[in-house]
Amino acid sequence: MDAKTFDKSKLPSRHVTVGPERAPHRSYYYAMGLTEEEINQPFVGVATCWNEAAPCNIALMRQAQSVKKGVKAAAGTPREFCTITVTDGIAMGHQGMKSSLASRDVIADSVELTMRGHCYDALVGLAGCDKSLPGMMMSMVRLNVPSVFMYGGSILPGHFKGKDVTVVDVFEAVGQHSAGNMEDEELHALECVACPSAGACGGQFTANTMACVSEAMGLALPGSAGAPAPYESRDEYAEASGRAVMHLLANNIRPRDIVTRKALENAAVIVAATGGSTNGGLHLPAIAHEAGIDFDLMEVAEIFKKTPYITDLKPGGNYVAKDLHEAGGVSMVLKVLLDGGYLHGDCLTVTGQSLADNLKDVKFNPDQKVVYPLSNPLSPTGGVVGLQGSLAPDGAIVKVAGMEKDHLRFSGPARCFDSEEECFEAVDKRQYKEGEVLVIRYEGPKGGPGMREMLSTTAALYGQGMGDKVALITDGRFSGGTRGFCIGHVGPEAAVGGPIALIEDGDIITIDAENGTIDLEVDEAVLEKRRANWKPRETMYASGALWKYAQLVGTARKGAVTHPGGKAEKHVYADI
């Protein structure tokens, strides 16, 4: 079908543009300067998570204008709108982080409502910060209109004392400062240069992890995840994304044609191979849920276990997203994995071609140091590992990228904290001991509510030189920037009476990341007595968005989702 001869009678926008009964609706479009020809064309939502909260999303509005050019060039009518985003770098370390994960689902919901309310026919979604990427992808799969995802790009690295630095170096410097190893002046000098441009955090933290996922899963154009936010080449990708969505619309290629079980498995492979964020284990099940596909944390973890870790990126490694882009980009990583038999090459992508077709001309660059060949991986198994055992019957997850093999097992006495603030205060004052397992609980999806990330605490531990001398477990989450023996997503969470709620100070906890186990060394009879005496805790959120989230949210194992998902739906928006 030619883009200029769309049959409006089969598109959602017919409900707001076609027939005499829609004259009032058309009058609004004329008020905004649209011509009759533009009103008769397909309407394409161009959704951005732009805001001025942080550098992560500040470049999205610029790139959205290029997307609109591409849509117009392909005979579509772009309709730009913004949704919210909560930026983790600003929300970190205080009550604001409770809003972070909840924002993912609000983003998906708000994009859905905007598309439904205005009957847009297709969608290009631009996102730059941790939860905005999966939130935007979730909305695409939920709506199932032809869609293209566009990452806003990463920040450029800062430079301090001759080394590249990121915002995580600043978080870790707080720990050095509290340990008396950094003066106020040095900390201030670092904070002033760590983040020199627009863009999301530069290491293989959550934003760049999910950007890699967007390419591996096929929702983004090849190469679009790589270029840093300030680069003008991003605008070329943006314009191409606008053209691409019109091609998808013309050929009726929808997100659920692309986001299949195989595509999700490809996404899990890229997370593991790049030493990506543990949040990938939360967001992939949530994206799958929108398509009605069962793909939980432990299934994701099985793929992590079988995938070699081949990309030397911070926080476990040495390089940042800009370096990966210059080395050959996500496409080169995918090509290495495809040639090694780790990817399903027959998966459809937004180019209209298969993943293998997209990668057929990509060559490995031997003159770079970021991506390793499969013959010499950084580790034979992925940089992220799933755990299961008596402490976490529903599973848990740990990032092992950059950890030495002899540090993959830890056993020690528990030290329990019922909030992140309690633990951070103890860490900041050095009121803990080497060899302890620090337990932060009641921070799960329901119990927080909001499943906060613990970067402030883990970075402080690392900055104090204790990152490999203690372990930390939580029913909350960890930032993609976390390093050290930090286990998150422990389920069932404390708020529903999971084993983590029954731990007492001094109980021995044993974690074996090599074999994928996490156990509480306490007799079952003792645990039964504790369980009988356990009472649910009330949160301080008795109304508002976080109260609503706590009522709806499910388990971390299944992605902490807030609605029944694709399996339960009786109609899909794209078919109205």
From Swiss-Prot:
Record-given protein name: Dihydroxy-acid dehydratase
Gene3D superfamilies the record matches: IlvD/EDD C-terminal domain-like
Matching PROSITE patterns: ILVD_EDD_2
Function, in words: Functions in the biosynthesis of branched-chain amino acids. Catalyzes the dehydration of (2R,3R)-2,3-dihydroxy-3-methylpentanoate (2,3-dihydroxy-3-methylvalerate) into 2-oxo-3-methylpentanoate (2-oxo-3-methylvalerate) and of (2R)-2,3-dihydroxy-3-methylbutanoate (2,3-dihydroxyisovalerate) into 2-oxo-3-methylbutanoate (2-oxoisovalerate), the penultimate precursor to L-isoleucine and L-valine, respectively.
Alphabetized HAMAP family for the sequence: IlvD (MF_00012)
Listed PANTHER family: DIHYDROXY-ACID DEHYDRATASE DAD, DIHYDROXY-ACID DEHYDRATASE, MITOCHONDRIAL
Enzyme Commission number(s) of this protein: 4.2.1.9
Binding-site list for [2Fe-2S] cluster: C56, C129, C201
Swiss-Prot/TrEMBL keywords: 2Fe-2S, Amino-acid biosynthesis, Branched-chain amino acid biosynthesis, Iron, Iron-sulfur, Lyase, Magnesium, Metal-binding
Catalytic residues of the enzyme: S479
Encoding gene, per UniProt annotation: ilvD
Species this chain originates from: Parvibaculum lavamentivorans (strain DS-1 / DSM 13023 / NCIMB 13966)
Enzyme class, UniProt record, top EC level: lyase
GO terms assigned for molecular function: 2 iron, 2 sulfur cluster binding; dihydroxy-acid dehydratase activity; magnesium ion binding
Cofactor detail note: Binds 1 [2Fe-2S] cluster per subunit. This cluster acts as a Lewis acid cofactor.
Assembly information from the UniProt record: Homodimer.
Positions of modified residues (N6-carboxylysine): K131
The reaction(s) this protein catalyses: (2R)-2,3-dihydroxy-3-methylbutanoate = 3-methyl-2-oxobutanoate + H2O; (2R,3R)-2,3-dihydroxy-3-methylpentanoate = (S)-3-methyl-2-oxopentanoate + H2O
Transmembrane segments: none
Protein family membership: Belongs to the IlvD/Edd family.
Pathway: Amino-acid biosynthesis; L-isoleucine biosynthesis; L-isoleucine from 2-oxobutanoate: step 3/4; Amino-acid biosynthesis; L-valine biosynthesis; L-valine from pyruvate: step 3/4
Chain residues that bind Mg(2+): D88, D130, K131, E453
GO terms, biological process: isoleucine biosynthetic process; L-valine biosynthetic process
Cofactor(s) in the UniProt record: [2Fe-2S] cluster; Mg(2+)
